[in-house]
């Protein structure tokens, strides 16, 4: 008689697919792991802390290698739990030190996302995805061309950090190569709220990756109600994909603006800052596209918007601007603004006393630059076909070996 596999319930209440009845411990933050150890295993909560450090500090996924656990506890863990990390389909370094991973997600490996590590002077930033694809249809973003497939689980989000940290040899309390995480990869993080917040909790936990709240940044296209909810549940840094300072232009670039126009978005950002003394600024991302949003009048509109935001929060430099040169991708109608236009745009903002940075383009030789992440191909069908070919190639190589 065939064994009936009962789906398990994830921490956010969603049902795990029936391929496994074991609890993936990567799906749990400290609180969830403590509860699992107490309620399911009948073990002391401190045991959860030991396992959490094995997973996130030492990158150990085999319970038998967790040598400070007794044999009986390891047996219970084998019976009720597992640690499933994303499968690395391939990883690709850039000439400038940027590194991109293509990670297969789920038991069948049919979905995949891209994760990018960007080193810089004194810091190393990991750009993490929250969804397979994206449904917001921002016209200048490569990810939008493939449509939306599904949300990532907590395990699949924090698993990206696990893969990168293991590759980098990143160990808390020693020299760090991974110092910052930005939720700026594929997908809209606030549309996968519970899983993203839980994963960010592990990133900031000393038993996890020990990052300060200000070193974890969530970037959103502007889901106003979820920004308000985030204000009550997390103290991470907030970044907003703005890209235009007037509603008419922004609606053509970011369709979500039709539902949450700029005035409502800026009010929610002000509420976010006022919600905690730990928050002192919001970063507004502005992708510069030739002849679209890079003219002097656009810069003056943005400067006025930033001054209004500072006044609303009653704090100087509450709004910071990050100018991003557009990164082209196949099929786009947009072009990158010239260096002269970029510097002229920045000068108008600086002259208006708006704190403004120009993001250095990194990883564009491996399609890892901002706006280029899309699972390597233009749509889901072709993307999944590529995964199958890649995985079949891996199987052939393994068989030959």
Curated annotation (Swiss-Prot):
Residues that coordinate or bind [4Fe-4S] cluster: 134, 138, 141
Domain Radical SAM core: 120-365
InterPro entries: Aldolase_TIM, Methyltransferase_A, RlmN_N, RNA_MTrfase_RlmN, rRNA_lsu_MTrfase_RlmN/Cfr, rSAM
UniProt keyword annotation of Nucleotide-binding present: no
Positions that bind S-adenosyl-L-methionine: 187-188, 219, 241-243, 327
Enzyme class: transferase
Record key words, sorted: 4Fe-4S, Cytoplasm, Disulfide bond, Iron, Iron-sulfur, Metal-binding, Methyltransferase, rRNA processing, S-adenosyl-L-methionine, Transferase, tRNA processing
Catalysed transformations (reactions): adenosine(2503) in 23S rRNA + 2 reduced [2Fe-2S]-[ferredoxin] + 2 S-adenosyl-L-methionine = 2-methyladenosine(2503) in 23S rRNA + 5'-deoxyadenosine + L-methionine + 2 oxidized [2Fe-2S]-[ferredoxin] + S-adenosyl-L-homocysteine; adenosine(37) in tRNA + 2 reduced [2Fe-2S]-[ferredoxin] + 2 S-adenosyl-L-methionine = 2-methyladenosine(37) in tRNA + 5'-deoxyadenosine + L-methionine + 2 oxidized [2Fe-2S]-[ferredoxin] + S-adenosyl-L-homocysteine
Known cofactor(s): [4Fe-4S] cluster
SUPFAM superfamilies: Radical SAM enzymes (SSF102114)
Biological process according to GO: rRNA base methylation; tRNA methylation
Function of the protein: Specifically methylates position 2 of adenine 2503 in 23S rRNA and position 2 of adenine 37 in tRNAs. m2A2503 modification seems to play a crucial role in the proofreading step occurring at the peptidyl transferase center and thus would serve to optimize ribosomal fidelity.
Additional remarks: Reaction proceeds by a ping-pong mechanism involving intermediate methylation of a conserved cysteine residue.
Identification of the protein by name: Dual-specificity RNA methyltransferase RlmN
């Amino acid at each position: 008689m065939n064994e009936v596999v009962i789906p398990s319930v994830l921490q956010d209440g969603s049902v795990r697919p029936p391929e496994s009845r074991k609890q993936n411990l990567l799906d749990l933050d400290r609180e969830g792991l403590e509860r699992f150890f107490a309620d399911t295993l009948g073990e002391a909560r401190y045991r959860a802390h030991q396992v959490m450090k094995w997973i996130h500090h030492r990158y150990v996924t085999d319970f038998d290698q967790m040598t400070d656990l007794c044999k009986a506890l390891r047996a219970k863990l084998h019976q009720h739990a597992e640690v499933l990390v994303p499968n690395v389909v391939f990883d690709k370094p850039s000439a400038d030190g940027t590194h991109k991973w293509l990670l297969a997600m789920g038991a069948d490996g049919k979905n995949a996302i891209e994760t990018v590590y960007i080193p810089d002077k004194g810091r190393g930033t990991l750009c993490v995805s929250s969804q397979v694809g994206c449904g917001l249809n921002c016209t200048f973003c490569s990810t939008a061309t493939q449509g939306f497939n599904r949300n990532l689980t907590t395990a699949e989000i924090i698993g990206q950090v696990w893969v990168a940290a293991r590759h980098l040899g990143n160990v808390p309390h020693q020299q760090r190569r991974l110092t910052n995480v930005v939720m700026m990869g594929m997908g809209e993080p606030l549309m996968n709220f519970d899983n993203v917040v839980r994963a960010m909790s592990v990133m900031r936990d000393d038993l996890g990756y020990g990052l300060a709240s200000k070193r974890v940044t969530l970037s959103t296209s502007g889901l106003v109600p979820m920004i308000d909810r985030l204000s009550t549940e997390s103290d991470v840094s907030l970044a907003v994909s703005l890209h235009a300072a007037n509603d008419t232009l922004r609606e053509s670039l970011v369709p979500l603006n039709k539902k949450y126009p700029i005035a409502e978005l800026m009010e929610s950002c002000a509420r976010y800052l006022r919600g905690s003394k730990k928050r002192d600024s919001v970063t507004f991302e502005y992708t510069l596209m030739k002849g679209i949003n890079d003219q002097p009048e656009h810069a003056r509109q943005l400067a006025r918007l930033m001054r209004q935001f500072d006044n609303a929060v009653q704090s100087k430099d509450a709004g910071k601007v990050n100018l991003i040169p557009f990164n082209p991708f196949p099929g786009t109608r947009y072009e990158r603004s010239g260096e002269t236009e970029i510097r002229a745009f920045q000068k108008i903002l600086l002259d208006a006393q708006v704190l403004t940075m120009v993001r250095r383009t990194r990883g564009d030789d491996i399609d890892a630059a901002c706006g280029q992440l899309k699972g390597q191909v233009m749509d889901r069908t072709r993307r999944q076909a590529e995964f199958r070919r890649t995985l079949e190639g891996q199987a052939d190589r393994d068989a030959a070996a």
